[in-house]
From Swiss-Prot:
It is a single-pass type I membrane protein. Residues 337-361 are annotated as: Disordered. The lineage of its organism: Eukaryota, Metazoa, Chordata, Craniata, Vertebrata. Immunoglobulin-like cell surface receptor involved in the negative regulation of receptor tyrosine kinase-coupled signaling processes. This is Signal-regulatory protein beta-1 isoform 3. Residues 393-398 are cytoplasmic. It comes from the Eukaryota. PROSITE patterns: IG_LIKE. InterPro entries: Ig-like_CS_Receptor, Ig-like_dom, Ig-like_dom_sf, Ig-like_fold, Ig_C1-set, Ig_sub, Ig_V-set. Keywords: Disulfide bond, Glycoprotein, Immunoglobulin domain, Membrane, Repeat, Signal, Transmembrane, Transmembrane helix. Disulfide bonds join 54-120, 169-227, 272-330. Residues 147-246, 253-347 form the Ig-like C1-type domain. It is found in: Membrane.
Amino acid sequence: MPVPASWPHLPSPFLLMTLLLGRLTGVAGEEELQVIQPDKSISVAAGESATLHCTVTSLIPVGPIQWFRGAGPGRELIYNQKEGHFPRVTTVSDLTKRNNMDFSIRISNITPADAGTYYCVKFRKGSPDHVEFKSGAGTELSVRAKPSAPVVSGPAARATPQHTVSFTCESHGFSPRDITLKWFKNGNELSDFQTNVDPAGDSVSYSIHSTAKVVLTREDVHSQVICEVAHVTLQGDPLRGTANLSETIRVPPTLEVTQQPVRAENQVNVTCQVRKFYPQRLQLTWLENGNVSRTETASTLTENKDGTYNWMSWLLVNVSAHRDDVKLTCQVEHDGQPAVSKSHDLKVSAHPKEQGSNTAPGPALASAAPLLIAFLLGPKVLLVVGVSVIYVYWKQKA
């Protein structure tokens, strides 16, 4: 029986089978697609490039791949296969190649701020917006960053020997968090210090702050305090920061006042020796009985081996100008500190008066007068007595 021309043409069994298999294949492709991120975590040094691997097992459903840092509504778009400008991101494979399933990316010039978990996400093509289809498990990127050079700071004001002063050491921007810090004075490790690493929790980078206590001695002008930082990112020696104790210490002077004889009559040379002081800034004032005689600023200093200085000032005193004893004072102002002083008592002796014509003879001269008279008049007396005796003799004989 012939088939009427008005009946619809029924699909052949082959066509039905083809359509059915195509539909089943598409559904199976969607169900079987997997987004594979083989690296659970990677670590990259700051300044280098990081490669984030991602492959898919199917090209179905049709739609782009996008990369994000973080998950949830606040995640950050790192790369979009179809649109956008991402100057630091390049693809590892040729995405224009047919049947490409490798969507790995490379991020250049990594900084600590790039640390985080990166997700490779497959989208299904939609209109007007694409719909997220499946995400990879994520790859955690950690950044190894070197610590900055340690900066050591001392106290704001100078301190004298036997006092305890504090020094601080800071270093920033390193990752991971583990770090070692040590203090040294002249090569000897210090133990009295406290160290903190911030923040306490997870962070893209960290900072370290340490405070050490140092007891000053008179020999510390040439001493150094060193802060040493060791970190996994440092290939060679640890980083070091240094502070010179010459910028911290003040060594007060010791004074000695002495009297030196001079050849000139009625003059005495008094010297003031200022010893073992640091820093150099010093002013000296001479006082006679409390009155200022002379003020001078230290110059032409003598440096000692320990870094301290010596200086000597002298004062020439005219003794004849004084009727009474003189108190000489050497007063020193060092580095803006209250003055210190040392005194010396200068004895003024009574001077003998010149003898005049009316000056009474002393006891010694009075006792010697009779002897002197006898010595001068003795021969004359004997002569007179002799002449008298001869005259009497001739008178009687006649």
